[in-house]
Structures are given as structure tokens and as C-alpha cells.
């Protein structure tokens, strides 16, 4: 998804700790990572730091919820704050939700794309392998608006041998 949506020099906000391949992919694509860290014991999103990470150069934010490796699940107030920043800066979100069905302790997964105005700004990543506890499958998918899916598919078709062009 990233190679289809960002250009060298674009800023991308990433929330740490993050999945280990995100930062190398961002750097390979020429993006400038803007990192915001959540920390134990409460894993609370520092909203002031998040707001400071956004600028007119921000192209997108990468959200991993439920978060790997921290298992943080973003709550509705945090997602609403992120949505406001996306609208303010005309930015997008790549939402890694591969662990969406692995939420415990009374917490609830809320996809960012379900918030008002976010369906056109979000690409959502899912995983059949994670959903069906077959992690070796490595079968993933994206959902989102046609414009974002099209851009991601054009880049992705040259990275694998099994992806149709459209």
C-alpha cells in the first residue's frame, strides 16, 4: 500500500512500538517517518505529540490496532482525534487491523474507517491467516475507496507474482 500512496519526501506518522517492517518500508519509499510513542503501563496515545507530528507535508498515518507488539486497542476518542487531524491536513490512514478479532478483556476494536468522513481516507489491511489462526497462510487483503485501492494495486502488482493488475 505504501509504495502506491507516498512519494519521496512525504511525511508519514507512525505510532510506536510498530510492526518491525514499517519503518524500513517507509525509508525505502523515501518517506520521512514522524514517530509518536505509546508506552506502558497504560499505552495512552499522547495527543499533543500526535498533533505536533502532523504538518502540511503529512501524507498519511499508519495505525496498527490492535497493536502488534503492544496489544493496544485504540478507543473511540483517540480515533476521533486522529480523524480530525486527517481532515485538517487532508491526509490518509493505512489501518493495519490484522488482529481485529483478537481483542480481549472487554475491549472493542473500532475501525477508523467507520468514523464519519473516514471511509474515503482509509485503506484497511486485514489477514485471513490471522483471522483463522493460520499465520503461515500469509493471505492478506485491503479494503478502501477505489482511488486508494487502485493506487495500492498498481504498486503491488510488481511486488508479487499473484496479484492481478485490477
Regions found by a protein language model. Name each.
Residues 16, 35-40:
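Short beta->alpha connector loops at strand-helix junctions that form conserved
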Residues 10, 31, 86-92, 118-120:
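A short helix->loop->beta-strand "cap" motif at the edges of active sites that frequently abuts
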Residues 38-105:
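Active-site phosphate-binding strand-loop segment of PLP-dependent enzymes
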Residues 1-11:
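Phosphate-binding glycine-rich loop
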Residues 28-34:
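A short helix-loop-beta submotif of the ANL/AMP-binding
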Residues 18-22:
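Conserved coil-to-alpha-helix start sites within the AMP-binding
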Residues 115, 119-166:
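Conserved core segment of the aminotransferase class I/II
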